[in-house]
């Protein structure tokens, strides 16, 4: 079985939120997966769709695979780098805020 990979690294969303969307399309055909992502109102859906479209383009251009036969064989979301930020609070105190990122990996295959 031929598998083609696309990675979106450093996506500006937490891995926990992106996994909710990734779970929706795992194992689906790419046409059905794109349909699900188009009608999802989550921010992560836009990012996952971008990675999926990249994987489809890689399969079509680099490996000459037929798009109609492709399905999402594997999709996983790993934690990326976290940016540490400071939120000033009352009486001279400060809280730490972590702006989380993630790496989205999509594999499509026949």
From Swiss-Prot:
A cellular component annotation (GO) from this entry: cytosolic large ribosomal subunit
Gene Ontology MF terms: rRNA binding; structural constituent of ribosome
Pfam family, one: Ribosomal_L22
Record-linked InterPro entries: Ribosomal_uL22 (IPR001063), Ribosomal_uL22_bac/chlpt-type (IPR005727), Ribosomal_uL22_bac/org-type (IPR047867), Ribosomal_uL22_CS (IPR018260), Ribosomal_uL22_sf (IPR036394)
Domain of life: Bacteria
Family label: Belongs to the universal ribosomal protein uL22 family.
Annotated function: This protein binds specifically to 23S rRNA; its binding is stimulated by other ribosomal proteins, e.g. L4, L17, and L20. It is important during the early stages of 50S assembly. It makes multiple contacts with different domains of the 23S rRNA in the assembled 50S subunit and ribosome. The globular domain of the protein is located near the polypeptide exit tunnel on the outside of the subunit, while an extended beta-hairpin is found that lines the wall of the exit tunnel in the center of the 70S ribosome.
Entry protein name: Large ribosomal subunit protein uL22
Gene that this sequence comes from: rplV
